[in-house]
């Protein structure tokens, strides 16, 4: 089991009709709260006595091979535990809006992947501390214009995500028994570069 605790704050401030400031901050503390125990089976679903393929006398019998992941207290990986954003929306003309948001994430930890080389029957695998991924951030730009087409209201939206084409690490994996560092992680996933989207919405 994993324990997920944290606090989150959102705010919106509109001093005048045409200007809006908004933001959010989320701070979490996610750790594995218990160890995990599993049992070995072959591809036919039969319980194994050992890793050489010997079939045990029964499921969860005394000779059914097992392994324990000693992971209690280790940080949960795969998702940033601190996220925040701050942005502005400006409406200079009737129906027109544009906005700019700064989005940041931190305290993101690498995930681990268990392979057959980590296992031995009836033993405990000590899960090492994951790599703390450097924080990342990007700017997102958006604009919209509302108007009428033959008496029908329509809105044209455009977005440029990651406006400055900034790359940062979003996810990574490290060996389950080796303390995670930048030079021993693998399967590193980076953020998307600059992307664009345009959408037309018509309300009938």
What are these regions (language model features)?
Residues 1-114, 201-203:
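Gram-negative outer-membrane beta-barrel transporters
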Residues 6-8, 69-74, 126-131, 183-188:
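Extracellular loop and loop/strand-boundary signature of outer-membrane beta-barrel proteins
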Residues 3-5, 80-84, 135-139, 152, ...:
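Residues that define the transmembrane beta-barrel architecture of outer-membrane proteins
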């Amino acid at each position: 089991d994993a324990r997920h605790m944290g606090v989150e704050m959102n705010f919106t401030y509109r001093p005048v009709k045409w200007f809006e400031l908004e933001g959010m901050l989320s701070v979490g503390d996610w750790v594995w709260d218990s160890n995990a125990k599993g049992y070995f089976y072959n591809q036919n679903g039969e319980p194994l006595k050992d890793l050489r393929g010997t079939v045990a006398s029964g499921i969860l019998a005394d000779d059914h091979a097992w392994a324990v992941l000693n992971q209690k207290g280790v940080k949960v990986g795969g998702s940033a535990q601190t996220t925040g954003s701050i942005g502005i929306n400006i409406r200079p003309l009737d129906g027109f809006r544009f906005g700019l948001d700064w989005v940041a994430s931190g305290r993101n930890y690498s995930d681990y992947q268990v392979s057959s080389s980590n296992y031995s029957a009836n033993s405990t695998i000590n899960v090492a501390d994951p790599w703390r991924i450097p924080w990342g951030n990007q700017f997102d730009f958006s604009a919209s214009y509302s108007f009428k087409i033959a008496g029908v209201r329509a809105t044209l939206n455009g977005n440029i995500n990651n406006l400055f084409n900034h790359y940062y690490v979003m996810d990574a994996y490290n060996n389950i028994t080796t303390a995670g560092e930048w030079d021993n992680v693998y399967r590193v996933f980076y953020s998307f570069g600059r992307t664009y989207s345009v959408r037309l919405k018509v309300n009938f």
